Regions:
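Base-recognition residues in the alpha-helical recognition helix of bacterial helix-turn-helix
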Residues: 9, 37-40, 63-65
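N-terminal helix-turn-helix DNA-binding core of bacterial DNA-binding proteins
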Residues: 20-59, 132
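Basic amphipathic alpha-helical segments that dock to polyanions
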Residues: 39, 51, 66-72
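Residues within helix-turn-helix
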Residues: 48-49, 60, 67, 87
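Charged, amphipathic alpha-helical coiled-coil/dimerization segments
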Residues: 67-125
Length: 132
């Protein structure tokens, strides 16, 4: 088996394990996996289109997730100072607390916890290069 084929298989398996981990964390916190991903990505205010890109989904799907989060008091839409027509998504105090819980839970029993901190840093650097 070629290295490229093996790499594709390993990355796919890791992705499946990460998806399962996110679903377990979300279930434990009483939110959906999509909400957990959105909370992870909303470290700073951003437009819906940027969030959708970070979540690797269509803007309409991200909008549905944000609508639910807004109803739950986790996110609010604020005017974008750079464009009066646009809105920025910003976490509320409750959203910030929930994001902290998500980030903490994601770091516990993560599929990559067997790797040392240095190995995880190397993996992150390699994946960034491969995905940009």
């Amino acid at each position: 088996m070629s290295t490229d084929v093996e790499l594709c298989g390993l990355v796919a398996r890791l992705n499946q394990r990460l998806d399962s981990h996110i679903r377990r964390v979300a279930d434990r916190l009483g939110i959906t996996a999509s909400q957990a991903i959105a909370l992870r990505e909303l470290g700073e205010p951003m437009r819906l289109t940027a969030l959708a890109e970070h979540m690797s989904c269509e803007t309409s799907n991200a909008g549905y997730v944000v609508d639910r989060m807004e109803d739950q008091g986790l996110v609010e839409r604020l005017p974008d100072p750079g464009d009066r027509r646009a809105k920025l998504l910003s976490l509320t105090e409750a959203g910030l607390r929930c994001r902290g819980n998500v980030l903490q839970a994601l770091s516990e029993q993560a599929p990559v916890e067997a790797l040392s901190a240095e190995e995880r840093d190397s993996l992150v650097a390699l994946l960034r290069r491969a995905t940009t």
